[in-house]
Amino acid sequence: MNSTSIRKATTEDIDAIHRILDMEPFKYDDNLPYERSWIEQLVLNERCLTLVYENENQIKGFISGEKLISGAIMIWFCAVKAEFQNKIIGIKLYYEFEKECKSMDINAILAYGYKTSADMLDRLNFYSSDATYREFYKPLND
């Protein structure tokens, strides 16, 4: 069966999420980037929202952010396995993330973009300056 879902991440997804980060631009050396404990916090901490894109019993991408005291949420990651990039998975994750944020009364989404993620954030109507490494902001008012 070819079932696809975007859902909240669970404890069982932590290793798959961690392995997705084992690629550019997240990788700095030959080691698996980021401590597993940090990925655990993104999944288990109630201040965080982590969604996974699952298809054919495989996690192909995820998006994760953390609620800030200001009422906004900061996106830490939106990553899709290299072999599944440019197949609208990232866009679908962003749309579902925004929908979840609105249901949680989050007032804005903050994100940093570089290279391809910056282009996608532009298409999703985030605001930014024109610097190479760009900070994005999107208010979530109806």
Model features per residue range: what roles?
Residues V80, K102, F126-Y127:
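Beta-rich extracellular carbohydrate-active architectures
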Residues T11-E12, R19-A72, W76:
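Acetyl-CoA-dependent GNAT
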Residues N86-K99:
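Conserved acetyl-CoA-binding loop-helix of GNAT-fold acetyltransferases
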Residues Y114-T132:
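Conserved active-site alpha-helix within GNAT-family acetyltransferase domains
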Residues C48, D130-E135:
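Short hydrophobic/aromatic beta-strand or adjacent loop that forms the aromatic wall/cage
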Residues C101-Y114:
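Conserved GNAT acetyl-CoA-binding A-motif
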Residues M1-E12, D142:
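Conserved N-terminal entry element of GNAT/NAT acetyltransferase domains
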Residues C78-Q85:
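A short, internal acetyl-CoA/4′-phosphopantetheine-binding micro-motif in the GNAT/acyltransferase core
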